[in-house]
Amino acid sequence: MTPTAEIHPLLQGLTKSDYNVESLDDEIRVDSLCVDLLRHLYQELVQNKGMQPEQAGERCHGADYFLREFVIPERHKNLFAVEAIDLRQFAGHWYIIRTPEPNLTELKKILTGTAELYNYLASQKMVSQETTDAITTQSEALDYFQKRIDDFWAIEGEGYDTWRDACPL
């Protein structure tokens, strides 16, 4: 999009501080706000980018998982304050230990959706392009994440501490 990209109606009244998470009530409220934001992203992808509904849904589902399973309930972090390190810690540690069968196919969908969301937010001047570029770069570190998954399955004896320390939460 161009620097003069229009601010879509959903984002016009958006206040970043509304996404702060300091209590359980905040978590519930922010969770709902994220659902609304992701619905808007879905519409953007289908209507303005010409993406097929199934693909747009997959992208939104990926971003949804990152935000509503990790950023909000685990980190209690405002989604507008997310940095590339958060995505690295999610994909290189949290996802692996929290998923019964962690795999790169599923993880790639989450990473792609998350990058799509942050690119959209940057186009609307809601996050910096620098942050978005770093998140996108991190989302493309698939060899690193595959190695983290493989190394996790290869842990023996006291090896978990070494694995954990390589990408701590």
Give, region by region, the residue ranges found by the protein language model.
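Eukaryote-specific, cytoplasm-facing alpha-helical/coiled-coil scaffolding segments in long proteins
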Residues: 120, 140-149, 166-167
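Non-catalytic DNA-binding core/recognition domains of DNA-processing enzymes
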Residues: 49-123
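Short, charged hinge/linker segments at domain and secondary-structure junctions
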Residues: 123-145
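Preference for solvent-exposed, low-hydrophobicity sequence contexts
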Residues: 1-4, 8
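Eukaryotic low-complexity, intrinsically disordered regulatory segments enriched in serine, proline
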Residues: 15-18, 22-29, 149-169
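N-terminal "first-domain core" detector
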Residues: 13-73
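Eukaryotic Ca2+-signaling machinery
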Residues: 46-54, 72-77, 156-169
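Charged/polar, low-hydrophobicity segments characteristic of intrinsically disordered regions
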Residues: 100-109, 144-162
